[in-house]
Swiss-Prot record:
UniProt keyword Ubl conjugation, yes or no: no
Subcellular location: Cytoplasm
Domain notes: Consists of 3 domains; the N-terminus binds the ribosome, the middle domain has PPIase activity, while the C-terminus has intrinsic chaperone activity on its own.
Annotated NCBIfam families: tig
Its job: Involved in protein export. Acts as a chaperone by maintaining the newly synthesized protein in an open conformation. Functions as a peptidyl-prolyl cis-trans isomerase.
Catalytic activity of the protein: [protein]-peptidylproline (omega=180) = [protein]-peptidylproline (omega=0)
Name by which UniProt lists this protein: Trigger factor
Family: Belongs to the FKBP-type PPIase family. Tig subfamily.
GO cellular component, one term: cytoplasm
Length: 411
């Protein structure tokens, strides 16, 4: 059936396929007989209408079904025979039609993964990054947690930034409020409003004029407003004493809390170090190897990135160069990872895929079914998840083969 293969470029092949006339006709007759079994023709019992009548009425339908079947089957056989690795569905440059009692001849253009000669990824230099956790880092976390878990308590001291104040106010434009709770420095009023309150104490009353910008809250936008403000209460955040923090967070003692913080920081540092090393390895590979990129794959990636930009409300006309550059980089990275994975015999088993689903479910506190539904909703398959596991396994190999150097030795 495969008559030949023509190399259009490093990323495109033309498959020339011919299916003998007798096979085509045999498939058409099979299709007509299947239709005959179900067709309802006036004057004939189901399944008893002559094949000539079936062909006259349903011939074009049968030919269309057969054409789709034969093109698909012959393409799959040609791919196996030539051992090419298509990246996208094939494209027919010309219309493909069945002509009765003639061979079915057609050509399909296929985008394929380019080959890279002498692909070498041994001893790529990566920086050995320290993941040691220092005591001051633990102390910083403790102080932050102490502040976050603290409560606002009344104070007789003058108000300062980040305090909560309870105020009454009236204005010369008829707007007023009672028992209005406001955090100094946090909006929605301009900074000058907070600055006017800072330094004032409980029970003080004062006046201040504030210029509101056009994009401010609706009642005051674009106006110069005079406020008369009475401070009814000032509250300041009181941090939880460090010696009591472990109880608030459900730990047995302070040492247990510190141990947990240390482990969390260490895990985060290890993850950051790993991502940095993976980035450096990929950067080196991208700089080392230059090859033709499959146009269709680049276009598809550009479309995906464009949709991502649009979802963020960005004007894509101002970012086309960046989108194009990013798409080419992503496709190039995909091809390099795929080639290395193939060379190393990397595959993703059903068990590994299930384990990845379980890991994601635990990480985000959702059910495994929820993970599957999320990926299936994107493109109807788990291919993206499988690719993620494949990529991770490839990078594990690259890291094992890398040359770790200390920071001071890094070039």
């Amino acid at each position: 059936m495969l008559k030949g293969i023509e190399e259009i470029s490093a990323t495109k092949k033309r498959l020339k396929i011919e299916i003998p006339a007798d096979i085509v006709e045999g498939e058409i007759q099979k299709a007509l007989k299947e239709i005959q079994k179900k067709a309802k023709i006036p004057g004939f019992r189901p399944g008893k209408a002559p094949i000539s009548i079936i062909e006259k009425k349903f011939g074009k339908e049968a030919e269309a079904d057969v054409l789709e079947k034969l093109v698909s089957e012959s393409y799959q056989k040609a791919v196996k025979e030539t051992k090419i690795k298509p990246l996208l569905p094939p494209m027919a440059e010309d219309a493909i039609d069945i002509k009765r009692n003639e061979p079915l001849s057609f050509e399909l253009v296929v985008e394929v993964r380019p080959d890279i000669e002498n692909l070498n990824y041994d001893n790529i230099e990566v920086e050995e990054i320290s993941t040691e956790v220092k005591e001051e880092e633990i102390e910083e976390v403790l102080q932050r947690l102490s502040k976050e878990r603290g409560t606002y308590e009344p104070t007789e001291e003058p108000a300062m930034s980040e305090d909560l104040v309870v105020i009454d106010y009236t204005t010369d434009i008829g707007k007023e409020a009672k028992d209005y709770i406001y955090k100094l420095g946090a909006g929605p009023f301009p900074e000058d409003f907070s600055k006017a309150i800072e330094g004032k104490k409980k029970d003080e009353t004062f006046s201040v004029t504030i210029d509101f910008p056009e994009d401010s809250i609706a009642d005051f936008a674009g106006k110069k407003v005079n406020f008369e403000i009475t401070i009814k209460e000032v509250k300041r955040r009181q941090n939880i004493p460090l010696e009591e923090l472990h109880k608030e967070l459900g730990f047995e003692d302070s040492d247990s809390l510190k141990k947990y913080i240390r482990q969390s920081l260490e895990n985060a540092k290890k993850e950051q170090a790993l991502e940095k090393q993976k980035f450096d390895i990929l950067k080196k590979l991208l700089e080392t190897y230059d090859f033709e990129l499959p146009e269709g794959l680049v276009e598809m990636e550009m479309k995906r990135i464009t949709e991502e930009y649009e979802s963020l409300g960005l004007d894509i006309t101002q970012h086309m160069d960046k989108i194009s550059e990013r798409a080419k980089r992503n496709v190039k990275a995909y091809i390099l990872i795929d080639l290395i994975g193939e060379k190393e015999g990397v595959s993703v088993s059903e068990e590994e895929l299930k384990q990845e689903i379980m890991n994601i479910a635990r990480r985000y506190s959702i059910t495994p079914q929820g993970v599957v539904q999320y990926y299936m909703s994107r493109d109807g398959s788990l291919e993206a998840l499988q690719n993620s596991v494949f990529e991770r396994k490839v990078f594990d190999i690259l890291l094992q083969k890398s040359n770790r150097i200390k920071k001071e030795e890094a070039v």
